[in-house]
Amino acid sequence: MRIDIMTLFPDTVGDVLSESILGRAQERGILRIETHQIRDYTANRQNQVDDYPYGGGHGAVLQADPLYRCWCHVCDEAGAPVHTIYLSPAGHVFDQSDARRLAKMDNLVFVCGHYEDRKSVV
């Protein structure tokens, strides 16, 4: 199984996922986890990924372009269809049935926004 994680904090995420059961699975070649820095896919010198929500509102949202470019790169690297999951506090609560279903998939992509939301065009 291959798991790709798109995040603004790849070092932190990578360190955590190299420990315990997941670390041993990677050592045995059962699991491959790759982290991807979303900022590497921006079109500006500042590597800015945040934007203001359309129509106003509080907080910041992730720009669509860097997310899309990063996701395309991940899909190309995987070389096979991927199942993409956008992690959000407003989303579905992960449970055991989700774990069983996802464990059967070969390529998973987790998008870690670390923001209240993302542009709705994503």
Q: What are the language-model segments listed below?
A:
Residues M1-C75:
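N-terminal nucleotide/polyanion-binding subdomain common to many enzyme families
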